[in-house]
Amino acid sequence: MKIINFIWKTRHDAYKVGKYWRHIPDCKTREACHVCQAEESMDHILTECSATGQKLIWELAETMWDERGLPWVWPSLGLILGNNLADFRSPCNTALTGANQFFTILISEFTYLIWKLRCEWRIEHGGNPDKIPEPEKIRRLWFQTLSRRLKLDCLMTNRSRYGSRAIQTSLVDKTWWIVLQNRSNLPSDWPKGGISGVLVGSGSACPPGRNR
């Protein structure tokens, strides 16, 4: 829900960033990024700035996406705001449901991670260049973010608990199977029985027949 709210507010220009501060007395210094000296717009924060890990976060997402064998689209603000419109297709023009869902997850989850890191750096640390998060921290949070989403999707397959809000086991399988460790040894109903982990930046080849 937090991610949905963030995307909605960003679409409606509801955040106080960049030029919002331009004509407010004593706040003009907030308009510019403390590191890049460019306007601290949402576009700059999510796709351009070097201060709070956005480049590394998107590079890690690209590495994970490579597991699907599909072209990566480097995020722009427009793509981020329309991330739920992903439409990857097979050579036969069949919608790749799992790939589209996974792309949406990568873009939405990591957009929000970038925003959280930015808020921490700007609000808690006053934009201090010495407090820019280290790559090790970013990688750790990246893995935690994706692992948490995977676990949530698996839990959401429980129809007795979530009813009409439950996610189909087949969709979870199509979305996540290709980035799981030891995937060739997993049972067909693995979302209901636990998972073995996530391949972060793995270069392992995809077993045939499951690029969905």
Language model regions located:
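Family-specific functional microsites
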Residues: 1-212
